[in-house]
UniProtKB/Swiss-Prot annotation:
<dbReference type="GO" id="GO:0031370">
    <property type="term" value="F:eukaryotic initiation factor 4G binding"/>
</dbReference>
<feature type="region of interest" description="Disordered">
    <location>
        <begin position="1"/>
        <end position="55"/>
    </location>
</feature>
<dbReference type="GO" id="GO:0000390">
    <property type="term" value="P:spliceosomal complex disassembly"/>
</dbReference>
<dbReference type="GO" id="GO:0051880">
    <property type="term" value="F:G-quadruplex DNA binding"/>
</dbReference>
<feature type="modified residue" description="Omega-N-methylarginine">
    <location>
        <position position="578"/>
    </location>
</feature>
<feature type="modified residue" description="Phosphoserine">
    <location>
        <position position="543"/>
    </location>
</feature>
<dbReference type="GO" id="GO:0033592">
    <property type="term" value="F:RNA strand annealing activity"/>
</dbReference>
<dbReference type="InterPro" id="IPR000629">
    <property type="entry name" value="RNA-helicase_DEAD-box_CS"/>
</dbReference>
<dbReference type="InterPro" id="IPR014001">
    <property type="entry name" value="Helicase_ATP-bd"/>
</dbReference>
<feature type="modified residue" description="Dimethylated arginine; alternate">
    <location>
        <position position="545"/>
    </location>
</feature>
<dbReference type="GO" id="GO:0002151">
    <property type="term" value="F:G-quadruplex RNA binding"/>
</dbReference>
<protein>
    <recommendedName>
        <fullName>ATP-dependent RNA helicase DED1</fullName>
        <ecNumber>3.6.4.13</ecNumber>
    </recommendedName>
</protein>
<keyword id="KW-0963">Cytoplasm</keyword>
<dbReference type="GO" id="GO:0006413">
    <property type="term" value="P:translational initiation"/>
</dbReference>
<dbReference type="Pfam" id="PF00271">
    <property type="entry name" value="Helicase_C"/>
</dbReference>
<feature type="modified residue" description="Phosphoserine">
    <location>
        <position position="215"/>
    </location>
</feature>
<feature type="modified residue" description="Phosphoserine">
    <location>
        <position position="576"/>
    </location>
</feature>
Amino acid sequence: MAELSEQVQNLSINDNNENGYVPPHLRGKPRSARNNSSNYNNNNGGYNGGRGGGSFFSNNRRGGYGNGGFFGGNNGGSRSNGRSGGRWIDGKHVPAPRNEKAEIAIFGVPEDPNFQSSGINFDNYDDIPVDASGKDVPEPITEFTSPPLDGLLLENIKLARFTKPTPVQKYSVPIVANGRDLMACAQTGSGKTGGFLFPVLSESFKTGPSPQPESQGSFYQRKAYPTAVIMAPTRELATQIFDEAKKFTYRSWVKACVVYGGSPIGNQLREIERGCDLLVATPGRLNDLLERGKISLANVKYLVLDEADRMLDMGFEPQIRHIVEDCDMTPVGERQTLMFSATFPADIQHLARDFLSDYIFLSVGRVGSTSENITQKVLYVENQDKKSALLDLLSASTDGLTLIFVETKRMADQLTDFLIMQNFRATAIHGDRTQSERERALAAFRSGAATLLVATAVAARGLDIPNVTHVINYDLPSDVDDYVHRIGRTGRAGNTGLATAFFNSENSNIVKGLHEILTEANQEVPSFLKDAMMSAPGSRSNSRRGGFGRNNNRDYRKAGGASAGGWGSSRSRDNSFRGGSGWGSDSKSSGWGNSGGSNNSSWW
């Protein structure tokens, strides 16, 4: 990585599910042994698919080791998670026996880079400042132990090769175990997914499912009553969370399902009808299923909003409010609500007051900024020279995966074609791709079959792709927050990464924010950027939530004018809160964009 960084610095440029529906009178009964024929489908079709279409190998999330292979089914007097899943019987959790083939499919093998869990700088997380504010903040954990974590979850964490909790996990586990709501603000790549999955699953394994309402009719519409609901802004992030949930629900009574727009709803309905205890969903598709009467939220104990600020930016606020406030979801105070994101400006914190009760605000690290594990380089490149500059960069890079961001779908296609013609293994992902094409492209990139992924904003937030060593902003975004989240695709889980940006006079609207980001992360600020900053009008960085400063990571209850009385202790580790000096008005934002449609696919 150091060698690559030096080379950059010296560049001369300026539904195959076999687990059918189980009738109520047979639920919980031993089932006849059948061969599991839906192993992971790894058919590599080569690279002649051009722009990342159908030529790469299939990664069918509906088959393989997914729901049908090892999970599925409710059970009348008890609760079961399919043939190889555990059961909840007479108030006790009875895990299923271990299955070596299932473990290889779910957790991989230690040398497999696609199942990466930690990096060479993981111990550096011990030095990251953490601040937790609110009443009676629990002491953080320092290692994965039982208690407070459930024993089965600890076994699954070990199988996933997680050796120590990240800062957000150190606090989220005891906070949830103590029945508190949580707003967690943590840097990209800091383990937020485990931050909510670990405590939610641990408590679910201990307490079991809630009793379902009395049946009204033969099968009560085969309605699902999940214990936990996790909402995410995009189908890719939802699928990623689901993949992680499958690891940590292994051998347990909890059956995980995922639903999102852009794919046939019939397959998703069939999965839900077979039982759903933990539901990962995009807001639009979840609204659709609620309207169809296929899901009830009456038994929800845990509500998780991941990438909450992005969901609101995308116009999902009306849909989220409808789900949380207008349907049959367990009310505030009777459920636990967890909000996770890399940024939580004041207006989002104000909105959280409607969803959370007596919550703890957790700020981890340089929130709203970039990781110091990422080396950032900004190069001055005119538009007509970008392809040549890109080839120079790629020639200097030999290992790992490279993620290239462009602003338009047309440019994604054009640049991918150009790279393929230059004999690079490239694929693309953007909003005009079908869901299956996007999944195949991501699978090819994760596996290394394609070493270059050209992407629009569809892949900018939340996706955790191991071994991304280099992020290139071929086109800089107009918003500095988008820049932060783009480059956060590298340097994840303690690993080091390189981020390179092509800058020219057309990027004047991001000058001040970019300068501030580089300065905060102790990165070199090139002279042309300093000159551009001096001549740029105004003094505010261009952020869609501008006006509050970059590090909007403090509890608004501490801000001037907000009532902070009665919140009690504030536990701080290594540092104190930083932040702007004014939070602006406490008003509902009305400019979140169009919320129409439940397909959840039109925003790209």
